[in-house]
Regions:
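N-terminal export/targeting leaders of redox proteins
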Residues: 1-35
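Electron-transfer interface patches adjacent to heme c in soluble/periplasmic c-type cytochromes
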Residues: 21-32, 44-52, 63-180, 189, ...
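Acidic/His-rich structured neighborhood in mature extracellular/periplasmic domains
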Residues: 185
Length: 244
């Protein structure tokens, strides 16, 4: 009997060692806050029913946005807005369509606890990460502390700050490295000219002026999303949204 107990003990130790080695091997490439944030960006346990992640709506192949008018959250529930891109978000003055977040860190946690999106209290999200062997190990390795709301937001922020578009064809054209096709040049002229007037709002190197605009769709009836007004409570902000 004693021999069986000893063998069982050593078998358990061996199994734990193998599992630990597996996790270490799997995560040798995750050494930075940004790398951890990238992994968390696709992590579904951060939603109430573990069905959606940040990447469910911020889809990489669609410029970290999606292709529908209203994005879907937990349980397939439609949200009230579509998903903005998270590209080129570094050093923006505010975030979300209505500017309700002042920093990337503040922005990062809001979708998790939004009942229409991921529907999970931040306290529960942190609890799940602490109960998850792999994530607990990664947070301790990178932040030198267990998962908490602050370092969770920091990881997301670090990842999102890496999502900069610096090598597009337009960038190359701006730096005299490539020529635009005739069709692309016509599009550029339309974009910056007085006919379409896109450039009035979509200017600067990231094609945004970081301002709020009302393009005339809000009517307070069937189109009743008041946008910035919901945050500022100023009548002049009715129907205004951040320039993407």
């Amino acid at each position: 009997m004693m021999k069986k107990i000893i063998l069982s003990f050593f078998a358990a130790v061996l199994l734990i060692t193998v599992i630990s080695s597996f996790f270490e091997k799997e995560n040798t490439g995750i050494k930075t806050k940004a790398a951890l944030g990238k992994k968390l960006f696709s992590e579904k346990i951060l939603s109430k029913d573990s069905s959606v992640s940040c990447a469910s709506c911020h889809i990489p192949q669609f410029a970290f946005a999606d292709t529908v008018a209203f994005s879907k959250g937990i349980g397939g529930k439609l949200t009230t807005r579509n998903t903005p891109s998270v590209l080129n978000m570094k050093n923006r003055p505010y975030y979300f369509w209505d500017g309700r977040a002042a920093t990337l860190e503040e922005q990062a946690l809001m979708p998790i606890e939004n009942p229409d999106e991921m529907g999970l209290a931040i306290e529960e999200a942190v609890k799940r990460l602490n109960e998850h062997r792999e994530y607990k190990m990664l947070f301790n390795k990178i932040f030198k502390e267990q998962p908490n709301a602050k370092n969770l937001a920091a990881a997301f922020s670090a990842f999102e700050q890496t999502l900069e578009t610096v090598d597009s064809k337009f960038d190359d054209w701006s730096n005299n490295l490539k020529e635009l096709t005739a069709q692309e040049e016509r599009g550029r002229e339309l974009f910056v000219g007085d006919k379409a007037k896109c450039f009035d709002c979509h200017r600067m190197e990231d094609f945004t002026n970081d301002e709020f605009k009302n393009i005339g769709l809000y009517n307070g009836k069937e189109l009743n999303d008041a946008g910035l007004f919901n945050i500022s409570k100023k009548e002049t902000d009715l129907g205004k949204f951040k320039t993407p």
